[in-house]
């Protein structure tokens, strides 16, 4: 089966060449299909250069979408082929990040980790099935991360959906407008256009923290009040370290991340409001 590619006609990538394979007509090497076969057999290969005239096949370990890649244009004989990503899709939404609760890996650290590409076709078959699902009862050993976070501007993201799941059921969500935003700036109250939390977009609603970096070990925070631990209240909190910042409501488990959200359609008191501990936080984009 031929791998499906994103194709960039008239371009030739110069960075990170692994191998250049000349055309051998007698062995039927002068096809894109054969060239893609070489790439599939090389775990480091992420991009193919193919010369449509000579049939030369070049394998590279640098994505055409990386900012540090060197690419020449207006070369009519060449085409760059990058295998399309294997990120899961749910309707019109594509998953770009899936935080898994309780695996003792900080969610924010992996979100910002530019070396992680779980959707790369050379490794996607080794990703546990649970990581491609929104159901936390199916085992997943990582925070699933795709190349979309590094190539955000290229994809033209229009909206972002943050979904929170417990045993496969969505228990909370926020939709953000993302025209002109980056992979970090979308998470801001000015971009919110819809939410399952009725008071999140109310005219009189205020936030003491609304941001991915949050506060100390609390990340992906949408919070209303820090008034001393018993008075803290908000909508979303990802505690990225055992024990968090020391409040009793952060100590519900010995493992992290500890992902908390409100059980109702409004903000909750983290101590007395009986918040939901979710097992999956998914960040999805509409392209």
Task: Identify the meaning behind each predicted range.
Residues 1-88:
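Extracellular disulfide-rich cysteine clusters
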Residues 84-287:
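Mature extracellular or lumenal effector domains of secreted proteins
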